[in-house]
Amino acid sequence: KSKYEATKQKTHSMISKLIKEDISDKKLLLLYDSYGITPEIVREEAVKFGKKINVPENFYARVAELHAKQEQEHATKRGEKLDLANIPETKALYFADYAKSKFKAKIMKVIDNKVILDQTCFYPTSGGQLHDTGTIAGEKVIDVFKQSNVIVHVLSGKHEFPEGEEVECEIDLQRRLQLAKHHTSTHIVNAAARKVLGSHINQAGAKKDIDKATIDLTHYQSITDEELEKIEKEANKLVKESLAVHSNFLPRTEAEQTYGMSIYQGGAVPGKLLRIVSIDGVDVEACGGTHLKNTSEAGEIKILKSAKISDGIVRIYFTAGEAAKKEGKKEKEILEEACRLLHVNIEKLPSAVSNLFDDWKFYKKLNEKLQ
């Protein structure tokens, strides 16, 4: 039984329960967002029950906008809306050069400890990628979020900046580089998982922090250890191939006609213009994150584990770059400590642990008999 057929069988079962009433746009969103079932498969299966399903043309754009709204509410940890009337769109400098760390900007508005600039290199939390930190005129920036098309910088304390004043700003470049490595690696892992597990794989969500990253994938069952090893091997193969990473802006309609709806991989990409990020011959996605210029810049990709987080959705935990090196060092230290405690070298550690477990079972049974 193919993976695609397994997904369709699950869909058939779910639709047989839902078909008694009309499947609304809201239910289509739920099926896609919670179970990884695309509206195209729903429409195909509904025909078998004599039902016609109308899929909105902007379905995937609505999914993206829903994710964007949820993400910003989480990112700002507040439901407040700032009064940004007459404030023009913030010019985002991070698209042109992800490694640019210093820039000058003009103060547009200050609201308590929140600063709006005319242009910025600070990336706001979006697309599952955490915000940048750094300084504005020496004052610490601890959070960055987007309200509509205006980027808001949150300082650690209040500061009186005169509107119109030019200020020198700097982002934490090491943090930015690590986040970029995790973001590009997310696209790489997504492509690797699609190759190993099947073409039904779609990204249902992701998070990129500095220590580790996660990617949620539409898959009908848990991922085995063997499959995880294959995904990691394929991901690192793509890194070693030194593939170019491109980005350009296209009108939404043109992007959809050129690349299809698979460009919507769970990230938040609302708007008429889409930024298309592509890895040569491997992956094409609509994405607004900061990315490397070449897959080789990601360094080693280390997959930590996977977990089934809901029906039809599995999560892969991984690290890349310096974070992967730290993870490897931590694992090495744990192994060395285990060897020290058991008084064996690393080659004999597995058998020593097995013997220890056998001894534990023996004495456990002996203790039960004596009681």
Give residue spans per PLM region.
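A glycine- and charged-residue-rich anion-binding loop/surface
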Residues: K1-Q371
